[in-house]
Design a protein with these regions (language model features):
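Phosphate-binding/catalytic loop of phosphoryl-transfer enzymes
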Residues: 1-38, 160-167
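ATP-binding/phosphotransfer module of carbohydrate and carboxylate kinases, centering on a glycine-rich
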Residues: 31-167
Length: 167
């Protein structure tokens, strides 16, 4: 329903509520030319609700993110613009998180939004913004970060079950 992040270090999992922070939000809003007070935390941009909200801000039409994905696949210019905005925001945020947490082991994306996004993502745009604004040494680090998508649904439940079985 939003944006969460966890860091795995050894046998420890550190969960965060990164989506409810405004870390980097001002820079994203400026880059994406979002001039609305409706975007106050990261998940107001980087989530299914965020995609819908950006579409509504741009067009005046309230549409679910799933339909925006479909419209994008069918060549709708407004939907493509919003998916590109999401792609840029997602790439920049993952890049910053990768550097903040030294994601040498890579990034695993989970959730239906990540799975749906993978099918329509402009990978060149993502890669450009994943590295954009970074120094050469940091680009070198980021180029080594693998990004994968967990294609299995309900991954959070499997994680919870694994935790319960360990206590």
């Amino acid at each position: 329903t939003g944006l969460g992040a966890s860091v795995i270090s050894g046998n420890n999992v550190i969960a965060t509520e990164i989506g409810n922070t405004n870390l980097g939000l001002s820079a994203l809003k400026s880059l994406l030319k979002i001039n609305s007070d409706e975007f106050n935390v990261l998940e107001d941009v980087i989530s299914g609700t965020g995609i819908s909200r950006m579409f509504e801000t741009n067009t005046g039409n309230k549409v679910k993110s799933e339909e925006i994905f479909s419209l994008s696949l069918n060549g709708d210019d407004d939907a493509i613009e919003v998916i590109d905005m999401f792609t840029i925001a997602f790439a920049r945020t993952l890049s910053d998180l990768s550097l903040a947490f030294s994601s040498g082991g890579g990034i695993i994306l989970a959730g239906s939004l990540s799975r749906s996004f993978l099918t329509i993502a402009n990978k060149d745009l993502f890669n450009k913004h994943f590295l954009d604004g970074k120094s050469d040494i940091h680009k070198e680090i980021l180029n080594k970060v693998g990004i994968k998508v967990a294609n299995r649904g309900y991954t959070c439940l499997f994680g919870s079950l694994n935790y319960i079985n360990s206590i």
